[in-house]
């Protein structure tokens, strides 16, 4: 049965307009993005099929083009649309964070860092640069690849902190495995960067590790 033949209250688009996006299932949200199904398969049925094939909504959203395009109903055009939507979401969070007078909400920082790093298929390391009132100056990804004390150069972090005229920084990196548990290498790296930045009077406020669930704060664990 075509979605057009469904009761209006059950159609994803009408349901979203009446109840808000949070009321929709992953499949219903994806169906709105897909817009149409394929022969013998409504957009909602296709969405359910895709979620089953990828294993989760997150896996679908983070898929790279070659894998994404192998699935029925998807291709380069849909991939481009999806990347545009994800980038708009990241920029929205960045703009919202910059509008805040100061970083008074740890949750706002967590939400922002999740949006920036969770989609990354490989390890990346970045810095959130702040002024003396902890207002956001910039966020930059500085290193990509295996993140450890040998691959992250304190001199480069210091250079970018000075270029942004930062008074403080929040360090962050992701664990693509999804496990947020800090390693000994993470603790060593954090201390090296704290020592280097202290020489130019820039404070390291925290180091967040992004994986599945909520980003982990090393400061909250007492490891700063």
Swiss-Prot record:
Coiled coil: none annotated. Keywords: Hydrolase, Metal-binding, Metalloprotease, Protease, Zinc. One of its GO terms (biological process) is proteolysis. Zn(2+) binds at residues 173, 175, 186. A motif (JAMM motif) lies at residues 173-186. Pfam families: RadC, UPF0758_N. It comes from the Bacteria. Gene3D superfamilies: 5' to 3' exonuclease, C-terminal subdomain (1.10.150.20), Cytidine Deaminase, domain 2 (3.40.140.10). InterPro entries: MPN, RadC_JAB, RuvA_2-like, UPF0758, UPF0758_CS, UPF0758_N. Disulfide bonds: none annotated. One of its GO terms (molecular function) is metallopeptidase activity. Residues 102-224 form the MPN domain. PROSITE patterns: MPN, UPF0758. PANTHER family: DNA REPAIR PROTEIN RADC, UPF0758 PROTEIN YEES-RELATED. Belongs to the UPF0758 family. This is UPF0758 protein Pmen_4376. It comes from Ectopseudomonas mendocina (strain ymp) (Pseudomonas mendocina). The lineage of its organism: Bacteria, Pseudomonadati, Pseudomonadota, Gammaproteobacteria, Pseudomonadales.
């Amino acid at each position: 049965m075509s979605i057009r033949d469904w009761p209006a209250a059950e159609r994803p688009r009408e349901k979203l307009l009446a109840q808000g996006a949070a009321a929709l299932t992953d499949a219903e949200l994806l169906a709105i993005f897909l817009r149409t199904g394929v022969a013998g398969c409504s957009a909602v049925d296709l969405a359910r099929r895709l979620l089953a094939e990828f294993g989760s909504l997150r896996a679908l959203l983070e898929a790279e083009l070659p894998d994404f395009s192998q699935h029925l109903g998807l291709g380069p055009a849909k991939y481009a649309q999806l990347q545009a939507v994800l980038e708009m979401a990241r920029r929205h969070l960045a703009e919202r964070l910059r509008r805040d007078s100061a970083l008074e909400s740890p949750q706002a920082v967590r939400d922002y860092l999740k949006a920036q790093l969770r989609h990354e298929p490989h390890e990346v390391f970045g810095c959130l640069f702040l002024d003396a009132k902890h207002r956001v100056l910039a966020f930059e990804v500085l290193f990509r690849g295996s993140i450890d004390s040998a691959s992250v150069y304190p001199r480069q972090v210091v250079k970018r902190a000075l270029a942004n005229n930062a008074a403080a920084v929040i360090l962050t990196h992701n664990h693509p495995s999804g496990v947020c548990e800090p390693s000994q290498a993470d603790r060593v790296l954090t201390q090296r960067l704290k020592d280097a930045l202290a020489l130019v009077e820039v404070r390291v406020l925290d180091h967040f590790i992004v994986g599945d669930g909520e980003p982990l704060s090393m400061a909250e664990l007492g490891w700063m």
